[in-house]
Amino acid sequence: MINDIISDSLTRIRNAGMRKLETTKLLHSKAVEALVGIFQAKGYIESFNVIEEDKKKFINVVLKYDEKGKSVINNLKRISKPGRRVYKGKDEIKRFKNGYGTIVVSTSHGVLANDEAYKAGVGGEILCTIW
């Protein structure tokens, strides 16, 4: 049984990128679907779709690579964990890696990227960073 589905999903994406796989399959949850949606909107993955196998839902993620065949995801790190939650205010999540990276934040408005959370004027739990 998996205790932290977000960490599991990030690890599956990271491992698939290192092995240069075209796709990877993640366990489905609303939080993971929102997280992958942000990754797609920011250009870190090609696409994703929800599939159902044996009455279980999965998210099929198509990874994105540059012209040299290297994954566009350089680093993917879980910040807030079940044993140690990390919360930040809107002013603390304004920029990350001089705008080249993204912080994914769980807010009262849903799961948002750092620039969207800043524009909405909300802070929240820092789920992960990606660049």
UniProtKB/Swiss-Prot annotation:
Gene3D superfamilies named among the record's database cross-references: 3.30.1370.30, 3.30.1490.10
Highest taxon above the source species: Bacteria
GO function terms (MF aspect): rRNA binding; structural constituent of ribosome
Stated role: One of the primary rRNA binding proteins, it binds directly to 16S rRNA central domain where it helps coordinate assembly of the platform of the 30S subunit.
Protein name stated in the entry: Small ribosomal subunit protein uS8
InterPro entries cross-referenced by the UniProt entry: Ribosomal_uS8, Ribosomal_uS8_CS, Ribosomal_uS8_sf
Alphabetical list of PROSITE patterns matching this protein: RIBOSOMAL_S8 (PS00053)
Gene Ontology terms describing biological process: translation
Keywords: Ribonucleoprotein, Ribosomal protein, RNA-binding, rRNA-binding
PANTHER family for the chain: 40S RIBOSOMAL PROTEIN S15A
One Pfam family cited in the UniProt record for this chain: Ribosomal_S8
GO annotation, cellular component aspect: ribonucleoprotein complex; ribosome
Protein family (similarity comment): Belongs to the universal ribosomal protein uS8 family.
Quaternary assembly: Part of the 30S ribosomal subunit. Contacts proteins S5 and S12.
